[in-house]
Structures are given as structure tokens and as C-alpha cells.
């Protein structure tokens, strides 16, 4: 197929997506899998599981992780500020959040959303929950 495209005068240009304004990877389990296990498949196009963050050890995007904070394995932090006394458990995802001395358990998603009026609302659920189902942390609600 590529030969036919080239033969007809079309050129293909690779676009580096990282860092970018927004890339939608699908479900929470899919982004966690990408950040923790699948990033090696995309290194050739310049992707990295640590982008524009103050750490070189935690999977993160546009985040500040203050020295002294604890982020356990297989967690992903995006657009967040984690202060020195904060603790994030294993396999958790924090997005658009600032935590100072909070302890985030294993397998938790905390996602902040800025509203048009400037206020922020947060949603919290289990890493394997589907927000479209009537379950929270795997239990019926």
C-alpha cells in the first residue's frame, strides 16, 4: 500500500505526538497499560511515559512531584502537583489534582475537572470501574 501511495505522488509525514495537548487512549485500563507496559512499542516515534514532569522515575505527564512524596509502582500522574508528604498507592491514576499530605490507596482514580465557572469538581472511582455502570469500587450502587 505504501508503494502505491508514494507512486501516486503522496508524501507521508510522521507527526510527533508527545508532548501534545490531548491524546485520547481509551479506557482507564488502556492508558494504565500503555504507561506501565506498552510504551516501548512507541519509543521509535518519540513517545515516553515521562513527559514534561519534575521526575525521572514516575510515569507522568505535565506534573510536579516534590522530593519526599511517595508514588508507588504502576501509578500514573498527569497534570498534577504531588507535595512532599503525599503518598500515592500502587496502580493509581491522578489527573488534574493537587495533593499535599493525603494518602491515596492502591487502584484508585482521582480526576479533577475545572468547570466553566472556575470551580473544580473531582470524581473518584476504582481503577477497574466503568463510570457508565452502576458500580463503585467494584460494588453495586
Predicted regions and their residues:
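Left-handed beta-helix
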Residues: 1-141
Amino acid at each position: 500500500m505504501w508503494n502505491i501511495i508514494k507512486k501516486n505522488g503522496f508524501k507521508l509525514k510522521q507527526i510527533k505526538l508527545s508532548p501534545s495537548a490531548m491524546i485520547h487512549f481509551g479506557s482507564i485500563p488502556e492508558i494504565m497499560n500503555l504507561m506501565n507496559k506498552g510504551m516501548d512499542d512507541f519509543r521509535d516515534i518519540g513517545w515516553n511515559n515521562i513527559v514534561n514532569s519534575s521526575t525521572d522515575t514516575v510515569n507522568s505527564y505535565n506534573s510536579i512531584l516534590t522530593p519526599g512524596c511517595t508514588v508507588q509502582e504502576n501509578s500514573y500522574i498527569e497534570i498534577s502537583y504531588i507535595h512532599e508528604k503525599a503518598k500515592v498507592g500502587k496502580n493509581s491514576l491522578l489527573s488534574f489534582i493537587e495533593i499535599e499530605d493525603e494518602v491515596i490507596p492502591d487502584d484508585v482514580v482521582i480526576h479533577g475537572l475545572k468547570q466553566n465557572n472556575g470551580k473544580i469538581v473531582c470524581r473518584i472511582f476504582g481503577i477497574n470501574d466503568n463510570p457508565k455502570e452502576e458500580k463503585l469500587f467494584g460494588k453495586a450502587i
